[in-house]
Amino acid sequence: YQEAYSFLQDLTSHFKILYSPRGLGYGDLHTHVNDLCAIAGGEYLFLWNDDATITTHGWDNIIREHQEGLHGNPVAVIQIDNNHAWKFGFPLVHKKIYETIGHFSLNAHNDTWIHWVAEQAGVERMEWRIMSEHDRYDLTADPKMRDETYTDIWNEQHGGYHQTHQLLLSNEQTLIREQDSLKIRNMIKG
């Protein structure tokens, strides 16, 4: 870690490192995302993966347009395009939304959670000028991507994809998302 830390320090002084237990792996992904959001200092929180790349040159200038209010209220969830059918995988969430609801997500399906909440609250904005490539094994069949992180998603002993998806669809979590959307709408109204 020291080598990576030194590299980051040379690159920028605006980073934080968070060490935490692995927990249940994919089943606890939302816990890690929420922990990172709590210490983030930026205006937007960007849900991202280590197997993804933004391919649009100048994408940060496009986000700056949203930040400056050129496309409506900057307090929004901005969705970007990618190379597969699910178009809500890498949202940028305004920090006020996180602060208003007190979390990014309460389920490992962070992208789906915030998409449903933002859509219902009327604060979701599509930004298809920004393109990303997601090199996930089940999308690209790239054998080097069939690693421990990928296989952990399907591990039912640790609350893998199917268990967390069932929880996501439960009445309890649906009600929480409805409450999240209402909190956001009330915050936007002032």
Please state what every model-predicted region is.
Residues 1-23:
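Acidic donor-binding segment of Leloir-type glycosyltransferases
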Residues 19-29, 53, 83-84:
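Short, acidic/glycine-rich phosphate-metal binding loop used to engage nucleotide
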Residues 31-44:
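Active-site nucleotide-sugar/metal-binding loop of Leloir-type enzymes
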Residues 42-53:
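Short beta-strand-to-loop acidic/aromatic patch adjacent to the donor-nucleotide binding site
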Residues 57-77:
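Conserved donor-nucleotide/metal-binding helix-loop-beta segment in metal-dependent transferases, i.e.
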Residues 74-90:
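Short beta-strand-to-loop element that shapes/binds the nucleotide-sugar donor at the catalytic cleft/hinge
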Residues 93-110, 117-126:
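Aromatic-glycine-rich donor-binding/catalytic loop that engages nucleotide-sugar donors
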Residues 112-190:
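C-terminal catalytic/acceptor-binding lobe
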